[in-house]
């Protein structure tokens, strides 16, 4: 999965964001298993990239929830 920019994430619906998070978590787990079994990572920065993307999605979801409560 490619890196999602904040502007791209903001265009997604809440359900699409949840789906992306689930997909990224599966990919993160797969990369973690590969790392723990001693396999060489295909891209060394991929794990941190996935974690950052998950955090970015969660942050935007929380921003949208806060805006909905204040509106």
From Swiss-Prot:
This is Large ribosomal subunit protein uL29. Keywords: Ribonucleoprotein, Ribosomal protein. One of its GO terms (cellular component) is cytosolic large ribosomal subunit. Gene3D superfamilies: 1.10.287.310. InterPro entries: Ribosomal_protein_uL29, Ribosomal_uL29, Ribosomal_uL29_CS, Ribosomal_uL29_sf. GO terms for molecular function: structural constituent of ribosome. SUPFAM superfamilies: Ribosomal protein L29 (L29p). GO terms for biological process: translation. The keyword Iron does not apply. Belongs to the universal ribosomal protein uL29 family. It comes from the Archaea.
């Amino acid at each position: 999965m490619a890196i999602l920019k904040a502007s791209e994430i903001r265009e997604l619906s809440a359900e699409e964001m949840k789906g992306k998070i689930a997909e990224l978590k599966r990919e993160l787990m797969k990369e973690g298993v590969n790392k723990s079994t001693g396999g060489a990572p295909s891209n060394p920065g991929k794990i941190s990239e996935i974690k950052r993307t998950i955090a970015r999605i969660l942050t935007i979801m929380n921003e949208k929830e806060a805006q909905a409560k204040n509106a």
